[in-house]
Curated annotation (Swiss-Prot):
Subcellular location: Periplasm
Assembly and oligomerization: The Tol-Pal system is composed of five core proteins: the inner membrane proteins TolA, TolQ and TolR, the periplasmic protein TolB and the outer membrane protein Pal. They form a network linking the inner and outer membranes and the peptidoglycan layer.
Record HAMAP family: TolB
Source lineage: Bacteria, Pseudomonadati, Pseudomonadota, Betaproteobacteria, Burkholderiales
The keyword Cell division is annotated on this UniProt entry: yes
Family classification: Belongs to the TolB family.
Protein name, UniProt field: Tol-Pal system protein TolB
Keyword Cell division: yes
Length: 433
C-alpha cells in the first residue's frame, strides 16, 4: 500500500469518528423519482368524514404513493367516496386510473377513530380487499394509518411489501449541537432521540425496530450506546480502551459487531446486546472496520486494507477462527461501507471513482457491480426494508444532505429536500412489528 493510499484509508477511518459540519435546523422531505412510463395510475378518493381530522389520511396515502416513484396519482375529484359505495369501474378507467381507493372514517365511543377502505382493480373490475384500522385522533396516528394504507396498496398492486410505515434515523448538527433524529419514512414527524454538544455517528437499527445503536463522543471519546426508543432508556455497549465504533446488529438482535482499537489497529469484535461477552473476530495487522451481518446471520462483511488498499471482505459470523476472510469487491481499488440487501442478494458500498466517491451496487451471485448515483461524495448507504431503495448521504450545493435511489439503478437519485441544514449518517429502519 502506498503512503498516500494508507493515509487515505486512515483518514476514512478517522472520518467515521467525526461528525458533520454546522448547519441550521434541517427538515427532511423524502422524494424518490421513478420512471414515468412504468408508473401505475391510481385514484384515491377523499374518505368520508375525514375533512374534520387534524391530518387527512388520503393526503398521506397520495404523497406516499407519489414519493415511491412507482405510482401516478389520478385526480379523483373532491367528492368523498365511501368504501360501501357501488363502483363504476368504467368511469374510473376512463379517468385513466387502473386502480381506485374508497374509504371512510368514523368516531368510536372511546374517542378513537376507525378508518375503513377498499382497493379496487378497475381493469379486472374487482375488489382487491381492504383494511379496517383503528387510530388515535392526532397527527401521528393519522399519519401512521395513511402509511399503512399506502403499504397495503403497494403490496397488492406491485407484489412487494411497502416501506411507508417504517422509520429513518439520521444525525443533524445545528451549530455545536448534535441531534440523533427519528422520523417517519417520508422524513416528517422527526423527534430527537438524543441531543448532545458532542458528535453522534453510526446509528444502526435493531431488527425489531425498537432500538438504535450509535456512537457518541459525550465521554470525550467514541463509545457505543444502545437507545431503547419506547422507554428512552440508553446504556453503554462498548467503552473499551481506544476507539469504539461502527455497531452492527445480528439478525436475531442478540449480538452486535463493533470495531475497536483495543490492541492498536482497529479490529472487529462481537458483544452481546447487553454489553457482555466481548469476543475478537478478526486478527490481522491491518485495519478491519465497518462490520455488517448478512440477513441469514452466517456472515459478516467488513472493510479492510489487508490486501494493500481498502476492499470489502466477508468472514463467518464466528470470526476468522471459523474460516478465512474472503475478498468480495474487485471493481475499483478503494471500496468501503458494505451493506447487504434484506434478501441477501445485493451488496451496496462506496467506491472511489475518478477522484470522487460513488454508491455502487454489486450482485453477490454474479459479482457484477455498477454505480447507481451521479453524485461524487457519497457515504453511509442503507437499504430500505424491502430492498427496493437505498438511502445514503452525499454533498449537494456545498451541503451535507441525504438522497435516495432505486437499488436497481432504474432511476436517478433524488436529493432529499432540506430547509437550510446539513444532515448525515442515515439508517433506514426495518419493517414495523
Amino acid at each position: 500500500m502506498s503512503l498516500m493510499t494508507k493515509l487515505g484509508f486512515r483518514a476514512l477511518v478517522a472520518s467515521c469518528l467525526i461528525a458533520a459540519g454546522g448547519a441550521a435546523h434541517a427538515q427532511v422531505n423524502v422524494l424518490i423519482t421513478g420512471v414515468g412510463s412504468t408508473q401505475f395510475p391510481i385514484a384515491t378518493a377523499n374518505f368520508v368524514n375525514e375533512a374534520s381530522l387534524p391530518q387527512q389520511v388520503t393526503s398521506i396515502v397520495r404523497a406516499d404513493l407519489a414519493r415511491s416513484g412507482k405510482f401516478t396519482n389520478v385526480d379523483a375529484g373532491g367528492t368523498p367516496v365511501p368504501e360501501t359505495a357501488s363502483v363504476d369501474f368504467g368511469a374510473w378507467k376512463a379517468k385513466g386510473a387502473n386502480a381506485f381507493v374508497a374509504g371512510s372514517v368514523s368516531r368510536e365511543p372511546n374517542g378513537q377513530y376507525k378508518v375503513n377502505f377498499i382497493l379496487y382493480d378497475t381493469v379486472k373490475q374487482q375488489s382487491l380487499g381492504g383494511l379496517s384500522l383503528t387510530t388515535s385522533n392526532d397527527n401521528e396516528g393519522m399519519r401512521k394509518t395513511g402509511h399503512k394504507i399506502a403499504d397495503y396498496i403497494y403490496q397488492k398492486l406491485l407484489g412487494v411489501r411497502g416501506v411507508f410505515n417504517t422509520r429513518l434515523s439520521y444525525v443533524q448538527r445545528t451549530g455545536n449541537v448534535y441531534k440523533l433524529l427519528i422520523s417517519d419514512s417520508d422524513g416528517q414527524n422527526a423527534i430527537p432521540a438524543l441531543t448532545s454538544k458532542e458528535p453522534i455517528i453510526s446509528p444502526a437499527w435493531s431488527p425489531s425496530g425498537t432500538k438504535v445503536a450509535y456512537v457518541s463522543f459525550e465521554l470525550r471519546k467514541p463509545v457505543v450506546y444502545i437507545h431503547d426508543l419506547p422507554t428512552g432508556r440508553r446504556y453503554v455497549i462498548s467503552n473499551q480502551k481506544g476507539n469504539n465504533s461502527a455497531p452492527a446488529w445480528s439478525p436475531d438482535g442478540q449480538t452486535l459487531a463493533v470495531a475497536l482499537s483495543l490492541t492498536g489497529n482497529t479490529q472487529i469484535y462481537s458483544v452481546s446486546s447487553t454489553g457482555s461477552g466481548l469476543h475478537r473476530l478478526t486478527r490481522s495487522s491491518s485495519i478491519d472496520t465497518e462490520p455488517f451481518y448478512s440477513p441469514d446471520g452466517k456472515w459478516i462483511y467488513f472493510t479492510s486494507d489487508r490486501g494493500g488498499a481498502p476492499q470489502i471482505y466477508r468472514m463467518p459470523a464466528g470470526g476468522e477462527s471459523a474460516g478465512a476472510a474472503q475478498r468480495v469487491t474487485f471493481t475499483g481499488s478503494y471500496n468501503t461501507s458494505p451493506r447487504i440487501s434484506p434478501d441477501g442478494k445485493l451488496l451496496a458500498y462506496i467506491s472511489r471513482t475518478g477522484g470522487g466517491f460513488k454508491l455502487y451496487v454489486q450482485d453477490l451471485q454474479t459479482g457484477a457491480a455498477n454505480a447507481v448515483t451521479n453524485t461524487t461524495r457519497d457515504e453511509s448507504p442503507s437499504f430500505a426494508a424491502n430492498g427496493q431503495y437505498i438511502l445514503y448521504a452525499t454533498q449537494s450545493g456545498g451541503r451535507s444532505v441525504l438522497a435516495a435511489v432505486p437499488s436497481d439503478g432504474s432511476a436517478p437519485p433524488q436529493i432529499l429536500s432540506v430547509q437550510g441544514g446539513a444532515i448525515r449518517e442515515p439508517s433506514w429502519g426495518p419493517f414495523m412489528q
